[in-house]
Swiss-Prot record:
It is found in: Cytoplasm; Nucleus. This is Leucine aminopeptidase 2-1. Binds 1 zinc ion per subunit. One of its GO terms (molecular function) is aminopeptidase activity. InterPro entries: Aminopeptidase_N-like_N (IPR045357), Aminopeptidase_N-like_N_sf (IPR042097), ARM-type_fold (IPR016024), LTA4H (IPR012777), LTA4H_cat (IPR049980), M1_LTA-4_hydro/amino_C_sf (IPR038502), M1_LTA4H (IPR034015), Peptidase_M1 (IPR001930). The lineage of its organism: Eukaryota, Fungi, Dikarya, Ascomycota, Saccharomycotina. It comes from Meyerozyma guilliermondii (strain ATCC 6260 / CBS 566 / DSM 6381 / JCM 1539 / NBRC 10279 / NRRL Y-324) (Yeast).
């Protein structure tokens, strides 16, 4: 049974604005970067229609200093409310004599030290060390700390943007040109505020396809170009064959400095990605398939609120794996899904009691909770598994016809779960009885794992499990003569990830690797390529396995490596593990490298340690 709201799409509870009173036609956003003060000033103009004849405009803000506000060129009084979890309301009075409904609302503001959307890096925290660097991350509700706005995915409009900076700059739009230190961009496709992005620093670019370039610090330009140029256009063409023509003109990627704490962000026209994708073996570039898929799911068709985040991420993971299937075969698609299923199990288990709230597909944020609190693997993996299940019931050939229909229907729009389901039932009217077999109540509202597990092709994962089991049983006997480097010679990086994850998981049972150091040392001798790997996903797990087994020579190796990455996926569990085996060493390396980390990353590591101390 569906718990339908009275109106769809339902209102976004994570904005303080009165966005429902206005139609936003266009936004002009002009930014200026001050690297001396680590501040960004903004002038934003919203062209709107006052559809309800309201007497005030209420915008979202957070940690901003508001300098002025005007409507249709007339200076207007404004009020900034006290900050709460979701920020501070900015209320601008519409002059009573202003009877027209077409308004241009202009606000000048400046960020503060507490801005959650921006990260300023000193030169020493960049890879090249030439100068400072700035990048933004506005998802989910951090755009309001960069400029006042209707900060909700329910509001989408075209943008004209500029940034003035002493260093080369990019934004989430099509480059229009440079005038002195001013870089101008246009985004004609309607986007929500969370997709506004800016980066500025020692940035160069190189082509990686007929409609793609990679941007990064000059020091890494050649290796980044090599990593992406063989696959980028293939990804684009595979995605277009699934949905429809790519609408954003260019698909570029910005590889950020090592201190970037995230995996990637699907900013339109220029995806921001972690440098840990650059492995030298092109094994991690499949991550680009995910960010590219966002060009349709999330960017073109958007969840109306963060309660329905699975519509963005579930669809994106589904499309990502379909792209991989087209390029590498269905066994690869299912292999990725199996890894995702395991990640989902681990994620829900790690939630503890909070899984009762945060492991359901449709969230309830109506109590004013921060959407970041709800962030997990659930919308990605549980959402994509639901779509896989629907595809299985309907049949892939028939479901493939629904994909472009869905994205055409909601193109440029924001929707909720119920509109998706209505669209599904409308398109498959002849399959109503089949769709009715889906336990929508459990899929959407019940916590825990999905009610149905697809019948995945396990051929690629079976090899990993079999080798791991072999090591387990031979470790018990202390006999290792049957292993050689040939065991893993044909493994992809992801297969090595599964193999190592399986070995690590054994330690959670009665078996403990610290009692089998001979096995770990033999493994290091036989599989020498793991210690030499440039693939962050593989190398991290290799270190985790060895340190979990109290192989002390790897403690300092892990500690030094944590100084070369800033991605929280590795940094947080890396320090937690090091802290468990040698707290003084963990503190030493954190003190040595903490200035290289993002502020959020530093605070999360400290929080992790506090949790450990209070257990």
């Amino acid at each position: 049974m569906l718990r339908r709201p009275k109106v769809s799409p339902e209102l976004d509870p994570s904005t303080l604005s009165n966005y429902g009173d206005f139609i936003v036609h266009k936004t002009q956003l002009d930014l200026a970067v001050d690297f001396d003060k680590n501040r960004v000033s903004s002038c934003v103009s919203l062209n709107v229609t006052n559809r309800t004849n309201t007497h005030q405009v209420v915008l979202d803000s957070s940690y901003l200093v508001i300098h002025s506000a005007s409507i249709n060129g007339i200076s207007t009084p404004f009020d900034v409310a006290e900050r709460q979890t979701l920020g501070s309301k900015v209320t601008i009075k519409i002059p009573p004599e202003m009877k027209i409904s077409e308004l241009t609302i202009t606000i000048e503001s400046e960020t503060t030290y507490e801005c959650t959307a921006l990260q300023f890096l000193p030169a020493e925290a960049t890879d090249g060390g030439v100068g400072p660097y700035l990048f933004s991350q506005c998802q989910a509700i951090h755009a309001r700390s960069l400029f006042p706005c209707f900060d909700t995915p329910a509001v989408k409009c075209p943008y004209e943007m500029s940034v003035t900076s002493p260093y080369p700059s990019v934004m989430s739009g099509r480059p229009l040109g440079v005038s002195g230190n001013m870089y101008r961009f246009s985004q004609p496709v309607p986007i929500p505020s969370y997709l506004v992005a800016v980066a500025s620093g020692d940035i160069k670019s190189a082509p990686i396809g007929p409609r793609s370039s990679v941007y990064c610090e000059p020091l890494k330009l050649e290796v980044c170009q090599h990593e992406f140029q063989a696959d980028m256009e293939h990804f684009l063409q595979a995605a277009e064959s699934l949905v429809f023509k790519y609408e954003w003109e260019r698909y570029d990627a910005l590889v950020l400095p090592s201190s970037f704490p995230y995996g990637g962000m699907e900013n339109p026209n220029i995806t921001f990605v972690t440098p840990t994708l650059i492995s030298g073996d092109r094994e991690n570039v499949d991550v680009i398939a995910h960010e590219l898929a966002h060009s349709w799911s999330g960017n073109l068709v958007t969840n109306c609120s963060w309660e329905h985040f699975w519509l963005n991420e579930g669809w994106t993971v589904y499309l990502e794996r379909r792209i991989l299937g087209k390029l590498h075969g269905n066994a690869t698609r299912d292999f990725s899904a199996i890894i995702g299923w395991t990640d989902l199990e681990n994620s829900i288990a790690a939630m503890g009691p909070s899984a009762e709230r945060w492991s359901m597909l449709v969230h309830n944020l109506k109590d004013g909770s921060d959407p970041d609190d709800a962030f997990s693997t659930v919308p990605y993996e549980k959402g994509s598994t639901l779509l896989y299940h629907i595809e299985t019931l309907i049949g892939q050939e028939k479901f493939d016809k629904f994909i472009p229909h869905y994205f055409h229907t909601f193109r440029y729009k924001s929707l909720d779960t119920y509109q998706f389901i209505d669209c599904l039932y409308s398109f498959f009217a002849d399959f109503k009885s089949v769709l009715d077999t889906i336990d929508w109540e459990s899929w959407l509202y019940k916590p825990g794992m999905p009610p149905v597990k697809p019948d995945f092709d396990t051929s690629m994962v079976d090899q990993c499990y079999q080798l791991a089991d072999k090591w387990y049983h031979h470790s018990l006997k202390n006999k290792f003569h049957k292993f050689s480097s040939e065991d893993i010679k044909s493994f992809t990086a992801n297969q090595s990830v599964v193999f190592l994850d399986t070995l690590i998981a054994f330690d959670k049972l009665d078996f403990k690797w610290k009692h089998h150091l001979d096995a770990l040392n033999t493994m290091a001798s036989v599989y020498q390529e793991y210690s030499k790997s440039t693939n962050a996903e593989v190398l991290f797990r290799w270190y985790v396995l060895q340190v979990t087994g109290h192989n002390q020579e790897y403690y300092s190796r892990l500690g030094e490596w944590l100084g070369t990455v800033g991605r929280m996926k590795f940094v947080r569990p890396g320090y937690v593990l090091l802290n468990k085996v040698d707290r003084s060493m963990a503190l030493h390396y954190f003190e040595k490298f903490h200035n290289r980390y993002h502020a959020i990353c530093k605070s999360m590591v400290r929080r992790d340690w506090d949790l450990i101390k209070t257990k």
